[in-house]
Each structure stands twice: as C-alpha cells, then as structure tokens.
C-alpha cells in the first residue's frame, strides 16, 4: 500500500489494540507524526482541500500518513504492513537524497529523528522497500565515520599476547612452559602486555561494518550517488589501515556506547545495526536477503525537508538559516538577504490546487514574527512553499538567485510563491 491509503486490515477489530494509532516516538515539541492514525470519514471535500496533506477518508479506519516503512499490525506478528511512497520506492534515488542531506552538515542526532529501526522483531518480506533501508543505514554510518576520520581515530590500551625474544609486560607462565620450555625453545618467552594502539575493539567493529557496507553498495547497482559513497568507504578504510577486522559476535554485542565520544557512540550503534541486519555474516548480503527487512519507518516529510536544506545550502551557503526560533514557531528556512521565509510541504502536485488556509496562516505568522525578524521590514516579507514533484535530480537553486523565484506570485495571495523541487529519480536501465 502507499502513503495516505487505508490500512488493508479490519480497523475496527484492532481499535482496542492500537487506539488512536501508531505515533512515532521521540518527537520534538510541536510535532505530531504518525505511522498510521485513526480517521473518521470526511465531509464532502471543498476545492481548496484537494491537495491537503491529510488523506481523503471515504471510510472510517486506520490510514497511513507520509511515513513509509514496514510494521507488524497485529500482536501475534502475522499481519505485515508495508507502506511505500506514492512515487514508488523503486524509482526514487534514496541514496541521492541521503547524500545531499549529509552534505548539508546535518548532525547525526538530527538525522536519527528521520528514521528508526527495530532489529529485535521478526523481519518482514518487503521487496518494494529493498532500495530504501540498507542504503539509508550505510549512508548514515559513513557520514559519522567520516567525521571520526577527520578528528582522528581514538586510541586505547589493547591487550596483546605474543611469543617474544625479550620479556614485555608479564610472562604467561603456563603457556610459556607449554610452548617454549617443554620444546626447549629458550630464546623465546610468551608474554602478555598492553599496547597503546588504534586497534581497539570499537575500531575493529567499525572497520568490519565498513567492509559490510562495501558489499551492500556493490549489490545496490550503479549511480552517481553510489560512486560518491564508495569513494567515502575507500577513504575511511585507508584511515583504518592499522586496525584489524577480526571481531567475534559476542564481542560485537558487548561493546558499550561512549557518552564522551558522541561520534563513536553513533558509529557503534549503526555498525551493530549493519552487522545484525545480515546476521553477522558477509555471505548473507545478497539480493534475495534484501527482500526481507526489519521493522522500520522513515518520515518522508522530514527527509524531504533535509534534502531541500542540502540543496539550498549547496546553492546559497550560510545565507540559509534552518529552524530559526520564533514566537510563532520554527520556520524550515529563513534567508535575511533577501528577506524570505521558506517552508517545505511534502504534498505532491501542490502546483495545481489552492494553498490550505492553515499553511497561509502559518507562513504569514513567520514573516511577521519579531523574534525571527527583529527589525521591522519595509514591506511584506515573501513566503515560499516548496513542494515535491517527479523530475530531473538537478538542484533547481544552483544556477539562480533566490530573488529569481519571487517573480511569479500565487494566483490568490500577495507575496506567496511556490517552488517545485523534484525528488531524484533513478535512471531507467
């Protein structure tokens, strides 16, 4: 099923179990995000609501929102629920979207709000989502590891054991007797000692996950964004040249997270997720295995928002301010030269219908907010709605000034403008 469609199971039978629906965890203040939610049948729809982000409800029940993913609908885990985008997940270049997001300078903790994965529940067969989850985790993981490489790998004291010519650390009496004394090898002594090295358990876990990620991308096909990630993997593996990749499954599970080294904390979580995804065996990274995915969700509205942020930052740099704290809320983007308020709305085909009244009020409030614009403007500040369409994956902002997008106004509203920013589409093979 696709976004905004009715759940294909008997909603009434599960109303006691789900209640109002499945609300996404860990939401920031002011957000109200759902994987699916109970909807009562709508009254007849008026013209200016045709392109609303709310689903058209012809029958009361649970309806999907703009969140895609896989989830078990029943407690016994016999009824899988797989939700895809209206555009078709097999057509969207998610790797391109993820790469643009990370190039915008988004922090790992912010990107973690876009998606969540539950590795403990049984996996769900969802071939239509095979191009989504693995590239997402790999791209997120590589962005974190890239930051670690820039700062330098963490070193620590590592326990070593070796048969040496000179005593180093402590002699392992029993093993030295068995390996050297009984064999009359008096020129050797078996020692246990500590060495300050990059070859720590955490770094070996990360390197192992990098090798797994390399195999994941190899079966993903060819694209410009894929080549960029492969280049990142080669750079990271070079930085881990003095680190081994041998690590046991029980060691992977026992590695503790770091509160001081935040990048390592995120990298360890993601590395454990990648290895768990393929049951800790690199031979399980196959096209057939990709058809089964763990329970997960991706908030497409937030992903699109960060994708647009990456495109804006690529074109206009630090002139674009993200989530400025205002008295009326947090606009997605604000530019002070020229003065513009921009907001993404994940509402496909928005160019044909009227803007919803609540959107007009929301952006009008931002443009008059003294916390956002402390100096009184000489005229009304332009408000821009950014919405998705299918099309070429190029950055529409890159070759234009922001003022150039303000030449065409909304047909019903002064100083309101719309910009279509395409979702990147994979080339037909």
Indicate residue ranges for each PLM-predicted region.
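Residue(s) in the substrate-gating loop at a strand-loop-helix junction
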Residues: 2-285
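Catalytic core segments in nucleotide and nucleic-acid processing enzymes
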Residues: 1-52, 287-429
